[in-house]
Amino acid sequence: MMTESILQIRDLSVYYNQKKTLKDVSLDLYPNEITALIGPSGSGKSTLLRSINRMNDLNPEVTITGSIVYNGHNIYSPRTDTVDLRKEIGMVFQQPNPFPMSIYENVVYGLRLKGIRDKSILDHAVESSLKGASIWNEVKDRLHDSAVGLSGGQQQRVCIARVLATSPRIILLDEPTSALDPISAGKIEETLLLLKKDYTLAIVTRSMQQASRLSDRTGFFLEGDLLECGPTKAMFMNPKRKETEDYISGKFG
């Protein structure tokens, strides 16, 4: 019996200044899976990711057609509350971006925006979120130190904890390890594999090894087209498209 998808993208196109940069993409995300989005720079991976929680709305030169259905509703409906949407569909960026405040305040930032002031609720959220991001033991004795003073890898895990604190169902990650050293990147990967037990994840990555290690499904993008999508093992062992095979084998990138 096939698992029902948690989010359905249908015929999604994105235009920047009337130039079509994402072309009629259809893709599903499935619960408790990691989907990797691979392809050369400028192929549309990050554009798709930013469309899933409407980050592209912040650019007035962007036009979007098609649909993304989550919880039975098209997220591009005028009735969609984008603040609530981004709590349900969180995002972690390429460069760690902790706010210039304490580790504690970074994690509870979204909760405070929701009006939560109860210290016991905030304390519990901080501990559970930092544990979820696999960094609690490293920072539990310095929660009121500035998050900016942490290493790059620790900062990125605090950013993951900040997303977890709002209780999302889907976590989007845009090359979350590309700015990190290999050891820090490895810790992030271990964290993501643990998180997929409770969340749905989609990750943009330039590393074929990372996509192979982490993901259950992979989508290959080229010049705005989703050329191929399917189970990662099958795609890496027997890609259906020559372009996919050439990219995975490093013939272009």
Swiss-Prot record:
It comes from the Bacteria. ATP binds at residues 39-46. SMART domains: AAA (SM00382). It is found in: Cell membrane. One of its GO terms (cellular component) is plasma membrane. Its main location: membrane. InterPro entries: AAA+_ATPase (IPR003593), ABC_transporter-like_ATP-bd (IPR003439), ABC_transporter-like_CS (IPR017871), P-loop_NTPase (IPR027417), PstB-like (IPR005670). The keyword Cell membrane applies. It catalyses: phosphate(out) + ATP + H2O = ADP + 2 phosphate(in) + H(+). The keyword Membrane applies. Belongs to the ABC transporter superfamily. Phosphate importer (TC 3.A.1.7) family. This is Phosphate import ATP-binding protein PstB 1. It comes from Streptococcus pyogenes serotype M12 (strain MGAS2096).
